[in-house]
């Protein structure tokens, strides 16, 4: 299930990156907010999944791949990395062990990531 969602995330971001010929401009693309939400969700999952014994996806490596696909300028890249780190830190402050709440958060984060990817794909890649 997570693999299918990630494939959708990757496809959406790849398509969005290809559809923005003006990416060299210092103006944020219209999907920047969704990208930052997606980055935050991935950072949170990077913390929570190993905590709960689910480490089949290396979210940090996947985030690096998505940034590479998007080819952002330095400022945008820093904001995406910052959103990823903020997502990680938000859950690291409150969770020391896997709880039912942590498992529910993972479930919601996967849904949020999937929704962000679908939104990016449907609005900007077609």
How does the language model describe each region?
Residues 1-12:
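Bacterial N-terminal signal peptides that target proteins for export
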Residues 4-6, 25, 118:
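Residue-level marker of intrinsically disordered, low-complexity segments enriched
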Residues 19-23:
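N-terminal signal peptide c-region/cleavage motif recognized by signal peptidases
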């Amino acid at each position: 299930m997570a693999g299918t969602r990630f494939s959708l995330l990757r496809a959406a971001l790849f398509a969005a990156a290809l559809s923005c010929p003006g990416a060299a401009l210092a103006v944020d693309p219209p999907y920047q907010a969704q990208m930052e939400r997606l980055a935050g969700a991935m950072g949170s999952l990077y913390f929570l999944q190993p905590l709960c014994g689910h480490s089949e996806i290396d979210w940090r490596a996947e985030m690096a791949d998505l940034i590479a696909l998007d080819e952002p300028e330095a400022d945008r890249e820093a904001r995406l990395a910052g959103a990823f780190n903020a997502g990680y830190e938000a859950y690291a402050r409150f969770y020391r062990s896997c709880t039912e709440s942590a498992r529910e958060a993972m479930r919601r984060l996967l849904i949020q990531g999937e929704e962000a990817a679908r939104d990016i794909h449907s609005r900007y890649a077609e």
